[in-house]
Amino acid sequence: MAVIPMVVEQTSKGERSYDIYSRLLKERIIFLNGEVEDHMANLIVAQLLFLEAEDPEKDIYLYINSPGGVVTAGLAIYDTMNFIKPDVATLCTGQACSMGAFLLSGGKKGKRFALPNARVMIHQPLGGARGQATDIQIQAQEILKLKEMLTRKMAEHSGQTFAKVAADTERDNFMSATEAKNYGLIDKVLTSRGEVA
């Protein structure tokens, strides 16, 4: 089990200790680390809604280091990012693969960033089915609908054509931060905090 660091803050009322993620949440920073799954998505959605209630005019920063995960869990985060009033800036630290890359590109245009050595990977959604032939056919139709929708959204976010994104996501497509910028998935590669507009 990972140890989560604690930070101690001095206030007029004495000392207060926070786990590091709670302290950063006060600065409107949310971490999306690890596999995107339902529990994680619920926590991130709750944090987005909380920060919107705190100040609907102030940007929220979503730091992403993820190998991807469950499409529907990622879409819950994506839809909430677009539903709330504050702009959600995205920043890739480490990797943003699959659904992680989709969420990275789904940040507010002009506020999508990656650190210099970050890696981004896009591909078509993965799935598997078993059971009766009819059930497998239903699952196949659903994954094809998701593939079409994700491709369309990624084309909108990147400025690429639907056909190009469809071709580029046929297999795992790895990119450096600079390549992700050139593709349109992010707006800027950051080398220092001062570069965040």
From Swiss-Prot:
Which organism is the protein's source? Haemophilus ducreyi (strain 35000HP / ATCC 700724)
Q: Name one GO biological process term.
A: protein quality control for misfolded or incompletely synthesized proteins
Q: Which reaction does it catalyse?
A: Hydrolysis of proteins to small peptides in the presence of ATP and magnesium. alpha-casein is the usual test substrate. In the absence of ATP, only oligopeptides shorter than five residues are hydrolyzed (such as succinyl-Leu-Tyr-|-NHMec, and Leu-Tyr-Leu-|-Tyr-Trp, in which cleavage of the -Tyr-|-Leu- and -Tyr-|-Trp bonds also occurs)
Which family does the similarity line name? Belongs to the peptidase S14 family.
Report the active site residues: S98 (nucleophile), H123
Question: According to the UniProt record, what class of enzyme is this?
Answer: hydrolase
The protein's UniProt keywords, in alphabetical order, are:
Cytoplasm, Hydrolase, Protease, Serine protease
Q: What is its main location?
A: cytoplasm
The uppermost taxa in this organism's lineage are: Bacteria, Pseudomonadati, Pseudomonadota, Gammaproteobacteria, Pasteurellales
Q: Does the keyword Disulfide bond apply?
A: no
Recorded hits in HAMAP family, A to Z, give: ClpP
For this entry, the protein name equals ATP-dependent Clp protease proteolytic subunit
This enzyme's EC code(s): 3.4.21.92
Q: Where in the cell is it found?
A: Cytoplasm
Subunit structure of this chain's protein:
Fourteen ClpP subunits assemble into 2 heptameric rings which stack back to back to give a disk-like structure with a central cavity, resembling the structure of eukaryotic proteasomes.
Here the disulfide bonds are: none
The Swiss-Prot or TrEMBL record annotates one GO molecular function as: ATPase binding
